[in-house]
A protein has these predicted regions:
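Conserved CoA-thioester-binding segment of acyl-CoA-metabolizing enzymes
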Residues: 1-56, 88
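Crotonase-fold acyl-CoA enzyme core
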Residues: 6, 91-204, 235, 240-243
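Terminal peptide-recognition signature
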Residues: 16, 20, 35, 53, ...
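Hydrophobic alpha-helical membrane-association signature
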Residues: 31-34, 82, 185, 225
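Glycine- (often His-adjacent) and acidic-residue-rich active-site loop
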Residues: 40, 47, 54-92, 105, ...
């Protein structure tokens, strides 16, 4: 497991906290494995009625760890099975998910919220998915879920053009439920999760399932995306794009993206 994923039970709520602040919560393979286990364990436990995802101040997640990307792009290792092992349970969980975003939500740090039932964000939240900029394709079922949520054009701007969405734009697009101050974020997330947990659990799970696409449809799209993602990751185009990104990123004063 990973020391960068903190799991806590608060009553009937399971809190999954990304805790790698020195890397802006860039997600490693071990972190994916820890989150996958938490989701599966929580779903199997009748005492858990809701999941919560939180990051650290200033970063929900800056996306996948770029060192893992580089290793895969140069053929040193495979990349993808750990992500799939997390994304499929994320799509198939029967229990509601509430999330809180403060600061960066990049790549999978954005697409994870398409699987959440309520997402709270602070005014400084920034959602961005630079997949195509890195020679890659959308993941986490976002190519299916985003157009359904916000329409083709906004989804295209987010997923294909890599445009950043502020908290306000994300709320307008339907990614964010409510914008709250930084100091109130975790309390509001927990309040919502506890409200969910207080409802009759079977009725809640059925109601949630009725409002969502069948899990097998989402899982099928995630698998299709992953196939293209893996193929793209070892392409010359992606290798050059990732190396160019790392070159820019390592320059003094260079922004994250």
């Amino acid at each position: 497991m990973s020391e960068h994923i903190l799991i806590e039970r608060k009553g009937a709520v399971q809190v999954i906290r990304l805790n790698r602040p020195e890397k802006k919560n860039a997600i490693t393979r071990a972190m994916y494995a820890a989150m996958a286990k938490a989701l599966k364990d929580g779903d199997a436990d009748d005492a858990v009625r809701a999941h919560v995802f939180l990051g650290v101040p200033g970063a929900f997640s800056s996306g996948n760890d770029m060192q893992d990307f580089m290793a895969a792009a140069t053929g040193d290792t495979s990349f993808g099975s750990e992500i799939l092992d997390f994304l499929i349970p994320l799509a198939e969980t029967k229990k509601p998910i509430v999330s809180g975003v403060d600061g960066l939500a990049i790549g999978v740090g954005t697409t994870i919220h398409f699987h959440c039932d309520l997402t709270f964000a602070t005014p400084r939240a920034l959602f961005r998915t630079p997949f195509v900029d890195l020679g890659l394709v959308p993941e986490a079922g976002s190519s299916l879920l985003a157009p359904l949520l916000m329409g083709h054009q906004k989804a295209f701007a987010l997923l294909a053009l890599g445009h950043g969405f502020t908290a306000e734009a994300a709320q307008e697009a339907g990614i964010v439920y409510q914008i709250v101050d930084e100091e109130a974020l975790e309390a509001e997330v927990m309040k919502a999760a506890e409200e969910i947990a207080a409802k009759p659990p079977q009725a809640m799970q059925i109601a949630r399932a009725l409002m969502r696409l069948p899990a097998e449809n989402i899982a099928d799209r995630i698998t299709r995306e992953a196939k293209h993602f893996a193929e793209r990751l070892t392409s010359d185009e992606a290798r050059e794009a990732v190396m160019a990104f790392l070159s820019r990123k390592n320059k003094p004063g260079c922004p994250l993206l």
